[in-house]
């Protein structure tokens, strides 16, 4: 009788050890255990690499000095603005007046067909700048077409940041920021030959943004 009990106890211990071994093999799937089949290692895919290409280097005095302003007085308004190379970038500053239905100011770079070559295939455009807490707008265009593409970006006062603007979120507009139904729905970065920065949306009062560069992320 005692021999039977000892045999049963030994059998139970063997079964329990086997169960623990199988459980261990299941848990440690990357370790070969006896005759158990080793699980395949899962390889996580890497995020695609990106490259930032500068399309307007406004940290260089010579390039910044080629930028000019256009404000609402062309439409009877009284807003004012100026540009200057200051603090290592293009300082675009002025005052927005709502008199005579005005309310916008802008600065733009020269026509440059090389912008499109640099920006071809871009997934986003970036504006690196020190803002003032107001919302600005990046406008890009192909000078051979009557439409442009725009996207707003809200700045953080006193902070230097790069504002990433996805290409697929640019909206086509006409000369007066009105709808442009004849324009392709999606911006083709390879067609860009001019960039501009606007402040509008009736943001009355003084403003200032210092732009270091505008880039394309490819």
Report the location of each language-model feature.
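N-terminal secretory signal peptides that target proteins for export/translocation
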Residues: 1-14
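Beta-rich carbohydrate-recognition modules and glycan-binding surfaces
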Residues: 2, 34-218
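Intrinsically disordered, low-complexity terminal and linker regions enriched in polar/acidic
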Residues: 16-18
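Short beta-strand/loop turn elements enriched in aromatics
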Residues: 20-21, 88
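Bacterial N-terminal signal peptides
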Residues: 21-32
């Amino acid at each position: 009788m005692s021999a039977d009990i000892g045999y049963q106890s030994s059998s139970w211990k063997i079964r329990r050890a086997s169960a623990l071994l199988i459980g261990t093999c299941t848990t440690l799937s990357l370790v070969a255990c006896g005759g158990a089949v080793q699980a395949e290692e899962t390889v996580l895919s890497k995020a695609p690499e990106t490259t930032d290409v500068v399309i307007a280097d406004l940290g260089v005095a010579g390039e910044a000095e080629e930028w000019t302003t256009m404000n609402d007085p062309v439409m009877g308004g009284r807003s004012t603005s100026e540009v200057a190379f200051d603090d290592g970038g293009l300082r675009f500053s002025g005052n927005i007046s709502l008199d005579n239905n005005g309310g916008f100011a802008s600065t733009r770079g020269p026509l440059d067909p090389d912008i499109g070559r640099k920006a071809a295939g871009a997934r986003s455009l970036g504006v690196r700048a020190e803002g003032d807490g107001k919302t600005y707008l990046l406008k890009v265009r192909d000078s051979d077409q009557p439409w442009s593409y725009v996207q707003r970006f809200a700045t953080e006062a006193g902070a230097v940041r790069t504002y990433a603007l996805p290409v697929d979120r640019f909206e086509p507009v006409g000369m007066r920021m009105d709808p442009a139904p004849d324009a392709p729905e999606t911006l083709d970065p390879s067609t860009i030959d001019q960039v501009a920065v606007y402040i509008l949306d009736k943001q009355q009062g003084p403003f200032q943004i210092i732009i270091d560069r505008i880039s394309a992320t490819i």
